[in-house]
Amino acid sequence: MDLENNTIHCSTFVQHTYIKLNPVGPIGAGRLPETRSVEEAQQYPTGWKFWLTILTMSALVVLGGLDTNIVATAVPSHASTRTPSPAASPLSPPATQRSSALTNRLTSVLSASYADSDIRDALETLSLRDIHNTPEVRRQLRLDVQKEVVDCNAEIVRDFGKVAEQLKRIGTVITSLNQTCDEMRKHISLARQDTAPVLEEASTLMNQKKEAETKQQLLDAFTKHFVVPDDDILVLTSLEDPINDQFFEVLARVKQVHRDCEALLGGENQRLGLELMDKSSRNLNSAYQKLYRWIQKEFKSLNLEDPRISSSIRRALRVLAERPSLFHSCLDFFAEARDYTLSDAFHYALTDAVSGTAGDSNVKPIEFSAHDPLRYIGDMLAWVHSTTVSEREALEALFVADGEELARGIQAGLSSEPWSRIDEHEEVAFDGQKALSDLVNRDLIGVSRALRQRVELVIQGHDDPVTCYKVVGLLSFYRTTFQKLLGPNSNLAELLVTLEKFTFGHFEALMKDVVSSLSTDHLALTPSEDLSTPQFLIDALEGLTSLMKTYEASFGADDTESTSDENRFTPVLRAAFDPFLELATSSAEELSNATARAIYLTNIHLTARTSVSEYSFVSTTHLNPISTKLSSLRIDLLEIQHRYLLDESGLQVLLTALEPFSPSSVAKSSTETEKQDSHPLESQPQQQPNLADIATLPAFQPEALIAVSQQLDDFLPSALMDATDNLKRLRSAAFVKSVTEEAVEAFCRDFEFVEGMIIGADEARGKVDVTRVDRGSETGAESEKGMEEGENGWGLRRLFPRTTGEIRVLLS
């Protein structure tokens, strides 16, 4: 075992020594890398391995762990042909066994890794000793190392001896310290026993001190929060002290105390909370009463025209809103004061004198224009409007500028005064604009009363319908203005609605009076000789035109609700147009001549249509009835002209004679025949009129027919002029022309019918009536005799030579 250990240590030592001191082999095999193991080094030349083996064996010999004979046997010669010596000791093991053991040992040594850090450190230490690789050094190396180890151990022992001496001294010191500590413990124990009662008493006193301090802090906090100083209470309730910022600060603090008292009522002992709440309630009531009186005093001297209204008044009103009863009472007082002030100002503007004081000489009183109702009423309404706007702006700055604050104050007041609610479940929301409008309405009650009296007096004393209607338009304009300014339910808006109805009623009464007086004036209702429009209707239409212009200027562009049946101007037409038109129409009954009556009515309706057609808001309701009436009158005039042409030309005689032969008469006869009871045995065949019979009619006898033809020839040259002159009293030339042209066209159609009958009669006279011949009656014989006379005698066409073309040319 020792040999094995020595071999391992020697091989390690040799390997490190070789690498460190002899990097190049004796035969130049090359440098062995320091990090290579023996297995890795086997790839180098054989010389390197040989020298490594020699060094290993030498080390073993030096260390005494291996016999030199074994080394000689184990190490091969440098030449490959060298063989081991056959000589062997008889007492030694066989050479083969020794060689095998050594080989195994060397193999294990050489197979070990020489890159171990311990081996490198050992070789490094060996290299630092500055020794030489000699046999002597190699033999003494172990001894030297052991000697150094022994020396080092001896030095360590000496050092530990010194340490032991120091430890003894330290132990002595520690023992002394322990004795001292024991004595101190005894003294401390005795002192603790003596001071324990004192400490307990001191701890008790400290706890009591803390409790007292806590109670003092609570008392201070309670006093600071719940107790109001007497000086502050005096500021809050004394009538001599002014209303200033300090008053509102104290009031806010007292209200906070009153609210916080509810927390004190939540405990078992409620006496303190009840007392504080009762005291704060009394103080608050006194403060609100003081504030209420102060606001009333300020309202008496308040000038709303001053743009710098005191901010303290606005603040006081916001605070007073928390007491709804006092707040509304204050508003009532303010409304009464403003009502008196504005009524006085309105009277001053009307008369320029209030309580004997003279007015401004540069401004004339409104009543100076009382003779002109329109201007007088307009000036009063303008003053009221200006005053309303100024009042609203001033009150808006006073009340509505802080509308949210007022709303919160009123809500808080309703909570404190639940009896102020009408319905306990209603939710009250403060509407600043509505409240402002209501207050302005109350301020203007006296002004509204005076305005109504004066307007009614002026209207009742005026008789001009046009002026009355202009006043209606003026009132309607201001009604719309005040509805936008104060709301549709305001007093002023309702007053103007009433005045508007009153004025329009007076207008209707005036128009009824005019119509009533005309209906009894026989001279005015008598148609003129020229059948022109009566003068009273012309005057009425002129007044109506003024009314329509007034309406158009005021409401025409905004009248978007008008329909074909009704609009805002329709009542005016019913009062100022329809009665006069009916009166003029009824006056035509005095004319016995139908032509004159038709012309007179046409002139009336043409004039009326001209007046109403210029304005859309009138034409939509009244133009259609007038146009319908004119269409009916036009038909009558057309019939008159047609009859005039037939009578003057003599053609009416021929048409009357030919009436049985007209298509309408034949159709009528056929219809009456079909209505009769028809049986095959009883019915007779319907006989068509024979055109040949026309020549037998009296009107178609030669003398009569020649007279008609001559009358026609005399009429035709001036027929158109005569027909136009027949309607010369009609005021519309275009109307006369259109009616005459249609009458001429009807006359031409009638002449064409007569001409056709004459030609047909002449043609029929050249034929035999088969039905009469078959019956063999005397009529058939007479017809044959007449035909013979027609062939040798006169013809209808020759006696009446005019043609339809000639007639159209002459009448064109």
UniProtKB/Swiss-Prot annotation:
Location of the protein in the cell: Golgi apparatus membrane
Q: Which GO terms describe its cellular component?
A: Golgi membrane; Golgi transport complex
Keyword Membrane attached = yes
Topology of this chain in the membrane? Peripheral membrane protein
Residue segments, region Disordered: 77-100, 665-688
Keyword Ligase on this protein?
Answer: no
Where is composition skewed (Low complexity) in this entry? 77-96
Q: What are the protein's UniProt keywords?
A: Golgi apparatus, Membrane, Protein transport, Transport
At the top level of its lineage, which domain of life is listed? Eukaryota
Biological process, per Gene Ontology: intra-Golgi vesicle-mediated transport; protein transport
Q: Which family does it belong to?
A: Belongs to the COG6 family.
Function of this protein? Acts as a component of the peripheral membrane COG complex that is involved in intra-Golgi protein trafficking. COG is located at the cis-Golgi, and regulates tethering of retrograde intra-Golgi vesicles and possibly a number of other membrane trafficking events.
PANTHER family cross-referenced by the UniProt entry? COMPONENT OF OLIGOMERIC GOLGI COMPLEX 6, CONSERVED OLIGOMERIC GOLGI COMPLEX SUBUNIT 6
- Protein name in UniProt: Conserved oligomeric Golgi complex subunit 6
